[in-house]
Amino acid sequence: MKSEQQYIDLYQQASQLIKTHSADVLNAVRDEAFADFKVQGFPTKKVERYKYTDMAALFAPDYGLNLKRLPIPVDPYETFTCDVPNLSTSVYFVVNDGFYTQALPQNKLPEGVIIDSLNRIAAERPDLVAPYYAGLAQTKDDAITALNTMLAQDGLFIYVPKQVKVDRTIQVINILRADVELMVNRRVLLVLEEGAELKLLFCDHAADNRRFLTTQVIEAYVGEGAQLELNCLEETHLKNTRVSNVYIDQQANSRVNHNVITLHNGITRNRLDLVFKGEGAECHCNGCVIADKSQHVDNNTLIDHRVPHCTSNELYKYVLDDNAVGAFAGRVLVRQEAQKTVSQETNQNLCATKTAHMFTQPMLEIYADDVKCAHGSTVGQLNNDALFYMQQRGISKREGKLLLQFAFVNEVIDKMELVPLRDRLHHLVEKRFRGELNKCEGCQLCK
């Protein structure tokens, strides 16, 4: 039986149960998503955007699903801290795919700002959710998005009204917890109206050493003159598989800073689709991957320049050890109307062993004639001359290797605008290279 058949059978048998526990706005697009998934099936490696990861194999195991929305016995405020020193944050939790409703007193938000369960707000305020939900994440274009749309029952909704600035960083801790091997389908909808500002940090953790499969779809609407900093930090374990699709819509003069940091995982597949729809917008998309053992990390990006006078910068760096596999495929599309585009795309990779593998494919597709665009990639090993130089000055070979690796990824971390988060990541990355960090050291469950 093909991998997709079990999900087709599941939806045919349980669609009414799924809809019973979901808001009408989410249900309105389920059947169409199901039809699209049936037509597409899981993409094979012959599909350009999925050539480096076998998606059918990821979804082949028989995972459990919490379709009845049974409560998960966990009090995240007692067990998870994920503290970032000197960073003022408002902390929220998503347990599997369910928003944890108990908020801390310090999570006071500016007037009009909403941070809540997507399913709850979709039921209570459909006027806020319906115009945006599944608008960017088109199910006809991607089978994983279609699968998530037909199965997702909850997640996170964030709304920031016009000209409102959220001063405190919003930290969302995604916790995976279950007594069985579990599939989680999480949905996130971010709406920033004109002139709004939001700094957001997602931290992914697994509280149980079980096998998890997570599909996640994030849709982010960034209005005219709005600013969004979206940071995603993954620290799970080798039994965890995560497939994440992020869709970002930028209007005129908006600014997005998107950072993806993968420190621990089993298999991670990240997709980013960002489109410029208004002039004067800019984005900075950065990725840092540290992988060893049998980890597999695949980042795939598309930056779509549809209008003139927009700027995009991408920098992704990988450090691969042992038998780890990394992949980066980045496509920058500059349409004919997008004159005066400025774009830079860079992928740099370090393979610490001969058994680590890196696949890299930066691409420029340009149809305008007045642009400044460049792209490039490198794959190399540690500089033996530099290692020898350090050994001559009393630095051990192991310590020299760690210093070179740390210096290599620092460029990505230093691009983060939140200084306390930047400092925290410097600390986590150093401990990761030293083999001293297996899980988030800020969580009580991980100690």
State where each predicted segment sits:
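N-terminal amphipathic, basic helical "cap/leader" segment at the start of enzyme domains
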Residues: 1-146, 315, 321
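Conserved beta-strand/loop scaffold segments within soluble protein domains that form the structured core
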Residues: 111-115, 124-395, 409, 413-447
